[in-house]
A protein has these predicted regions:
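Conserved PLP-enzyme active-site core in the AAT-like
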Residues: 157-324
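Short Gly/Ser/Thr- and Asp/Glu-enriched loop/turn motifs at secondary-structure junctions
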Residues: 143-145, 180, 405-410, 442-448
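Short loop-beta-helix segment that forms the pyridoxal 5′-phosphate
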Residues: 130-163, 210-213
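PLP-dependent enzyme catalytic core of the Aspartate aminotransferase-like
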Residues: 443-483
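Active-site C-terminal subdomain of aminotransferase-like
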Residues: 292-396
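Active-site nucleophile and cofactor-binding loops and adjacent substrate-binding regions
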Residues: 119, 148-158, 187-188, 245, ...
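Conserved PLP-binding catalytic core of the aspartate aminotransferase-like
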Residues: 402-430
């Protein structure tokens, strides 16, 4: 043992403290249903409970874990609660948590193959597994012209797709001289907000983002897309990319990929497909129809951190021609040069993303797939969809309520027929109760309540209780009247 002074945690203490953390996490999951799903703290309350200055001397680990329980836990909205039905889920699981712990313990930085070969090769291999598991086009396999990479989120995947599309449309002139303001992107108004952010970052500009009208089911209209592309060409614009969605955030709408894909193919336009939430459903053969037309896509992404029990962050981003992505993003300073890179025999994922550094995200995904197996994952996806369909049926059978959009998978959009003010009050009452957490959207200007079934440990009793609580709070509001 060295006699040098050290403030590091000893290996013995690390073992003991690590066991305490695992026990704390396990206990948290055992008691998670005892907490209000939505945190009840007020703005600034957490900071007010913390010291104004950092400690000069180190504190015992027991004090840290005590303060997590006392100071931090009250400010947590419990995303892993089985009664969390808000937004889209950001679920986790025991194998994912353990895989992430190992990733943190190894502490690798996987920017290059050479900086940790296993980090790169496991990622490539697991993403190839997913192509097979989801029935994706073979062009997304690493053995083809394309391949996959793990991004932090679908937002980053969309940005990378737009950057690659921009360079292809300009013959890589934009990287050299910047954008001229003539590139145009297309998406439905239901597309994720990250599309708008990405066109700003990529230099296309929000005025060059065309929101194409949707049909009665909130899906993009192909004929309107074709008409807008023609108008833009006549005006001297350069159609650059179409961002289609399989399972929009507001309503789970499914854009018609076969028709959109043919339009993109005929016009030489990049097609990016965002299936962040719904993509996991394709694990089940009976739901793979959502991917019809994906053979036209130049890029595609879905989020295992939403519905495949792999804790945040983990987005799987695929491209049909990896050279186009790499050529758009690659920069090789001398300090990154190495024999493996220059051999051309390896993948350097730094060229597939905006940041240079990258975590070993594939490890937790590998753990999840190996723990559950394909059939285990399918079981839980099917169960979630069945529970959502049961909830949708209850809505349809109650004359006070109506479905606000089709419910093809695990998201149900509904509202009370009394109007927006009633629905806003209902949502507020439900969330204040702490018994569950729901969020809203607006469709055709109407206030809509969303319920998404996708949390790892959600069971039928939680969905049944959600419907009971909706009924109870509805009855109270109806008695109050004035709507």
């Amino acid at each position: 043992m060295s006699n040098e002074k050290s403030y590091h945690m000893s290996i013995e203490d690390f073992r003991r403290n690590g066991r305490e953390v695992i026990d704390w996490i396990a206990d948290y999951y055992e008691r998670i249903e005892s907490f209000p799903v939505l945190s009840r703290v007020q703005p600034g309350e957490i900071r007010a409970s913390l010291p104004t200055e950092a400690p000069m001397d180190g504190e015992p680990f027991e004090a840290l874990l005590h303060d997590v329980e006392k100071l931090i836990l009250p400010g947590i909205t419990h995303w892993q609660s089985p009664s969390f039905f808000a937004f889209f889920p950001c679920n986790a699981s025991a194998p994912a948590i353990l895989g992430d712990l190992l990733s943190s313990g190894l502490g690798v930085q996987g920017m290059l193959w050479a900086t940790s070969p296993a980090c790169t090769e496991l990622e490539t291999h697991v993403l190839d597994w997913l192509v097979q598991m989801l029935g994706l086009p073979e062009k997304f396999l690493s053995s083809s012209t394309g391949g996959g990479v793990i991004q932090d989120s679908a937002s980053s995947a969309t940005l990378c797709a737009i950057l690659a599309a921009r360079e292809r449309a300009t013959g890589y002139a934009s990287n050299k001289r910047g954008c001229k303001g003539d590139l145009v992107a297309y998406a439905s108004p239901q597309a994720h907000s990250s599309v708008e952010k990405a066109v700003k970052i990529a230099g296309l500009g929000e005025e060059n983002l065309r929101h194409i009208e949707v049909d009665a089911h909130w899906a993009l209209r192909p004929e309107s897309l074709a008409a807008q592309i023609a108008l833009d060409r006549q005006a001297g614009k350069v159609p650059c990319i179409v961002c289609a969605t399989i399972g929009t955030t507001s309503s789970n709408a499914l854009d018609p990929l076969p028709q959109i894909g043919r339009i993109c193919e005929d016009n030489g336009i990049w097609l990016h497909v965002d299936s962040a939430m719904a993509g996991t459903a394709a694990l089940c053969p009976e739901f793979r129809s959502i991917n019809e037309g994906l053979e036209f896509a130049d890029s595609y992404c879905f989020n295992p951190h939403k519905w495949m029990f792999t804790n945040f962050d983990c987005d799987c981003f695929y491209v049909a021609r990896r050279k186009e992505l790499i050529d758009a993003l690659s920069i090789l300073p001398d300090y990154l040069r190495n024999k493996a890179t220059e051999s051309g025999a390896v993948i350097d994922y730094r060229d597939w993303q905006v940041p240079l550094g990258r975590r070993f995200r594939a490890l937790k995904l590998w753990f999840v797939i190996r723990h559950y197996g394909v059939e285990g994952l399918r079981h839980h996806v099917r169960r979630h969809i069945a529970l959502a369909q049961q909830f949708a049926l209850w809505v349809q059978q109650d004359q006070r309520f109506e479905l606000a959009a089709p419910a093809p998978l695990n998201l149900v959009c509904f509202r009370h027929r009394a109007g927006d003010a009633f629905n806003e009050a209902l949502l507020d009452a439900l969330n204040r109760s702490g018994d569950l957490y729901l969020t809203h959207t607006k469709l055709n200007g109407r206030f809509i309540i969303r319920l998404c079934v996708g949390q790892t440990y959600t069971e039928s009793r939680h969905v049944e209780r959600a419907w009971e609580r909706i009924g109870e709070e509805t009855a109270k509001l109806e008695v109050r009247g004035g709507w």
